[in-house]
């Protein structure tokens, strides 16, 4: 029993952060306070009006505090602790991929491309975009409007003739001397930059001026080119939703909450245009106040620096924040410029907020339907297998090409569906090519021949294969020498029918020693197909990546003495990989940095392939 009176006697009145632990020593809640003593004392009053707080207090075994120099410092430390410990009584934003941006590189002939992750490449970044599809769509549009290269530098540096993009008018061909001058190319780059900045009218004004100049100089072909470009840009502008009011870059956050599930909709506005939106479904403890949810989400969302998010000038929310000022100060510090949080907006901002609220509600309805369907499928599978509960399932699959570059995948489902943070791939080696049984054995040993926490022990393990694969899996488990309960998982083989069609699978249930054929409309079968397909796609994705690596290294980089620089020199001077393969020994020797001995090694290696 936690002795609150004795603990509180030694707590300071200074600002800081507190961490609450349960009897297992796990952090169950992280909070901050202007006055640690006052805040912590409030948890141990006789009458607590919050069910969430009552539940939290009943699990407290110990509390640790950290004094900070200011409330702002406490706020930042709180979010760092929440991210590190993932406490169950805090609102948790599930870790998310970084946002994609459009990158305009800083080179003699800049290229325009998508970028995700840390901004190490020199150039200008535009975004963020809500997902990769929005970036691809924008890049495709830019390619039609402005003939700027989108190719990788490895392709650009080794061209001896213009590519197909030049032939169809989507690139001006800066890789080949004489096709476009540096000035003309830079002009198109400047137009693309203005377009991405939302300055469409400036682009049109410049192009109209260019068209008129070309016409006055009787260069009608050039004038016609600019005319077509103007028409294409006008057609795009007409389709875009643009606010007439001058708006700063801003993100709009709206929350919808129902039946224990919260949806936070983030709408991205840049230069008055809607770039897109994204839905988030944070883990929310029961009876959480929506203002607290909004406050925590804003902090976690913008303070995860590794995500590469740019903090906009304005953040609009649909709930009043208790610590709005502290958040503004912290976000301003992080952004290096003034950041405003607004919760009472009018005009176009109000329209955008309403749009975000509608999207949040629509996404929540879809999520609730999906959650209900998953629960129904779990219930059906529990009844089929006579299990009281299923909390965690894992599924294995093997992928290879003619026995080469073998990859095994393991995907994990919990009661909410795919748990992608726990997905794993395993490189399989040291087996006979094409031996799927040995591959499965190696994957299972890598996964389970180690200590496991109780919550990580699966209730069901699906093996994608027939009796042979399942029997090999059972042998592996029989030989495991581990401290956790290896008899807990129910191993099930999922065998495809003779026609290998979905809906004709047979379940081979190990502990019940029976085979089950389910009807195509069975909810239990749909859940099994879902996890099996996830495992299959995960394995194929890993295999393709490994195969591509092997392919790129099978030529030059696999040769001892040929690194990235020498490989680039060979490709550049001999006109690509095919040129290297067709080159004579003397031609290879003439490449700068390639000695006679290395040239002979390259020549002999490529001839023997």
Curated annotation (Swiss-Prot):
Q: Which GO terms describe its biological process?
A: nucleotide-excision repair; SOS response
The annotated subunit structure for this chain is: Interacts with UvrB in an incision complex.
A single Gene Ontology molecular function, please? excinuclease ABC activity
SUPFAM superfamilies membership:
C-terminal UvrC-binding domain of UvrB, GIY-YIG endonuclease, RuvA domain 2-like
InterPro entries found in the cross-reference section: GIY-YIG_endonuc, GIY-YIG_endonuc_sf, GIY-YIG_UvrC_Cho, Hlx-hairpin-Hlx_DNA-bd_motif, RuvA_2-like, UVR_dom, UVR_dom_sf, UvrABC_protein_C
Domain of life (superkingdom): Bacteria
User: Where is this protein primarily located?
Assistant: cytoplasm
Domain named UVR is located at 201-236
Recorded family membership: Belongs to the UvrC family.
Q: What is this protein called?
A: UvrABC system protein C
